[in-house]
């Protein structure tokens, strides 16, 4: 088994993250809300976005195997409004060949620790209703379904629902 390192993202990871996102959005049965063309953004703006998130105290992690970014993970707080600064939005993607190897569990543990350390009161996420594996992972970490967005996305000639899930720390 290849060694998988989970670490904080850096600006230098921008190109690898973009490649990872393009790869996963190209999978025929993946549950992401963008196309490969939409994921293919210039490196410099992505690099700047990584820097900005880290400077704001957000959690931005990558998992790496043999020098390749194989997962991206974020917990982002919108600092625009004081009344919602206790809420962080979680996002995660893992390359197909590395799924079911505990990477998601390791990333979720890091998110819970980060949320407690930063005194985050609420972690929330959105997941496709058909993404049973991801939903199971989130439930394992105490996330609960709060609602459903019907016909949230239209991909591959059909509509998909999404679920809003959260975990409260307060």
Q: Across the structure, where does each feature detected by a protein language model lie?
A:
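Acetyl-CoA-dependent GNAT
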Residues: 25, 38-97, 108-109, 168-170
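Helix-loop element at the rim of GNAT/NAT acetyltransferase active sites that forms part
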Residues: 19-37
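Glycine-rich phosphate/pyrophosphate-binding loop shared by adenosine-nucleotide-utilizing enzymes
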Residues: 2-4, 66-72, 160
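Hydrophobic adenine-recognition pocket in adenosine-nucleotide-binding enzymes
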Residues: 9, 92-94, 127
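Conserved catalytic-core motifs of GNAT/GCN5-like acyltransferases
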Residues: 124-127, 139, 144-160
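Conserved N-terminal entry element of GNAT/NAT acetyltransferase domains
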Residues: 1-15, 163, 170
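Conserved GNAT acetyl-CoA-binding A-motif
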Residues: 108, 115-126
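Conserved active-site alpha-helix within GNAT-family acetyltransferase domains
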Residues: 101, 105, 130-147
């Amino acid at each position: 088994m290849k060694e998988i390192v989970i670490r904080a993202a850096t600006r230098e990871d921008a190109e690898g993250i973009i490649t990872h996102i393009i790869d996963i959005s190209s999978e025929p049965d993946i549950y992401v809300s963008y196309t490969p063309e939409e994921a293919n953004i210039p490196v410099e703006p992505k690099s700047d976005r990584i820097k900005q998130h880290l400077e704001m105290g957000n959690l931005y992690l990558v998992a790496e195997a043999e020098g390749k970014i194989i997962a991206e993970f974020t917990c982002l707080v919108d600092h625009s409004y004081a009344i919602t600064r206790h809420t962080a939005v979680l996002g995660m993607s893992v390359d197909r060949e590395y799924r079911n190897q505990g990477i998601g569990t390791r990333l979720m543990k890091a998110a819970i620790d980060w949320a407690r350390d930063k005194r985050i009161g609420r972690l929330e996420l959105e997941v496709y209703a058909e993404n049973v594996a991801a939903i199971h992972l989130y439930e394992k970490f105490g996330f609960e379904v709060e609602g459903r967005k019907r016909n949230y996305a239209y991909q591959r000639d059909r509509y998909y629902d999404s679920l809003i899930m959260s975990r409260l720390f307060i």
